[in-house]
């Protein structure tokens, strides 16, 4: 049985977590063994939801707190090394949220060759895309975005992935997330008094 490692900075209640939970359910339904590794913050409720979906869950931070700077890199290195030794995943799927690049670089350094990254936002939150482009070109098998607009904001072009899409030279794609499409964004003036 193929083991898939899902890497995510936090397991709270948000769109990325719900999308990742849907991903876990799909992998489990196809017969894969899924291990979800949460680096930092988590809610017990969300951990239980992932477990009920069929994933084993490893929370690296016993207190659910974030570790920053060099200590954070060392913390992630030790935690990911322990998870890789214990579960020996065939594929790592990293949710590209802060710290997005560091876990990918550490996984590569620790010998993981099959890495997929998914970014859940558009590129305007990044002051510079050089690191994202380096990761996309040299460190991951595929870099997926949740909308074509997001993919274009990162890479200048987009392509909706389907089962016939070849995974060769071009390794960034759009795979729409499974969140309801019916959200409307309303711009309104609000007074905070």
Enumerate the predicted regions with their spans.
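Membrane-interface segments of envelope glycosyltransferases acting on lipid-linked substrates or membrane lipids
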Residues: 1-193
């Amino acid at each position: 049985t193929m083991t898939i490692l899902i890497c995510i900075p936090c397991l709270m209640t948000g769109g990325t977590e719900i999308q990742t939970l849907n991903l876990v359910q799909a992998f489990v339904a196809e017969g894969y063994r899924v291990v979800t590794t949460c680096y930092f913050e988590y809610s017990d409720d969300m951990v239980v939801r992932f477990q009920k979906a069929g994933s084993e869950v490893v929370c690296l931070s016993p207190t659910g707190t974030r570790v920053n700077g060099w200590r954070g890199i060392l913390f992630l290195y030790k935690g990911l090394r322990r998870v890789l030794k214990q579960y020996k995943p065939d594929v790592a799927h990293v949710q590209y949220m802060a710290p997005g690049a560091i876990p990918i670089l550490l996984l590569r350094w620790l010998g993981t060759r099959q890495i997929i990254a998914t970014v859940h936002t558009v590129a305007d939150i990044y002051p510079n895309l050089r690191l994202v482009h380096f990761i996309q070109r040299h460190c991951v098998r595929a870099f997926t975005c949740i909308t074509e607009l997001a993919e274009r904001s990162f890479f200048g072009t987009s392509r909706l992935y389907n089962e016939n899409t070849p995974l060769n030279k071009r390794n960034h794609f759009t795979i729409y997330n499974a969140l309801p499409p019916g959200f409307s964004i309303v711009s309104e003036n609000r007074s905070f008094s």
